[in-house]
Amino acid sequence: MTVTGFFTDSTLCIGCKACEVACKEWNEVPADGYAFSGKSYDNTLALGHSTWRHVKFVEGETQAGAGGNLPDMLTWQFSSDVCKHCENAGCLESCPTGSIVRTEFGGVYIQPDICNGCGYCVVNCPFGVVDRRPTDGRAFKCTFCYDRQKEGETPACAKACPTQSILFGDLGELERIADERIAKLHSAGMTDATIWNPKDSSVGGTHAFFLVRGDPARYNLPASPEIPTTALKPAWSAAATAAGVLLGAALLGFALNRR
């Protein structure tokens, strides 16, 4: 079975939100309310229980007008954000019911009929992707269009993208395409373009990676994301060692007292 992924090239994104609409239509995701917040021209703001694809509007520094009566203009970058489907997924590791599973395509899938709404997955996602629906408390996020992939179909968001900013396919092939694309941009003078795929962090790489210009953190892509559960392993080890020492001391004291 082919291990698949998303490669999102933000330099090709035009902010049309076709991916958001296609995702909602295919998955029958409830409406968000669509109200402007005053913080941005974006009307969905972030990923959540009812927004599984989110086109982020990133405002850059003001550039001088091209002459004449043209005003100074903000620079804009757009990027379509989504669940990263981490290799080491904190949500999956922390789920107590087995609701969250790894599919044969490599994606991380929440089975809503098993989810008990405990929320452990929410706090263990390093990207703030997983969110609980307020009506019943169950957790929701991008499904990687598992139903479409099983039928050999492309996920709705990638199929709807008019500029091929969102590419879907074999993960290894997408990484090769990304390397070629970044080399082309650098040769064209866009030296601030970079690939974000945190393979050296505790998430171990992702099945959704991005090409962005400037600091990836501006696109809600942290430089070194960490899974909260990784801190538990040394903590449990230290606790077990301490318990062993205390037990040994107690047994030694008991033996000495019997003499």
For the regions a language model picked out, list residue spans one by one.
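Non-ligating segments of multi-cofactor redox enzymes
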Residues: M1-R259
